[in-house]
């Protein structure tokens, strides 16, 4: 009996794991759609990073002409959103009213938090977080718009942090 239960649970775990993290196929689709949106809008070269819910890099592209620090900036936007559980627009808003707090969190995070728009959480329909997108290269608002386009094209909900009540689960 106990062995059968263990075997049954082991078969379920991979299925649960796959639903709690963004997969490579969809992460790459997000990156590609975000870059396509940037080209449609005539934006400067972008760098796009998609992290899973654990903060690990899943998909990444840096367009020709992107500057040296763009990969780190894109990942920091996404990582900060994951670490705080809110889109980086909300982190920017907090930084404007509580700069000491955001500065302390950034120090705690080893400088891996960029408090400007462009770090967007990827949510499932049940509002669970499965990853985040970080984009840099244009204005922060344009970076964020491209992230939202990519996330929504992949069938997920984008959480920019603009409406903190919208994604409470």
Outline where the language-model segments fall.
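Flexible, solvent-exposed loop/hinge segments and secondary-structure transition points
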Residues: 2-169
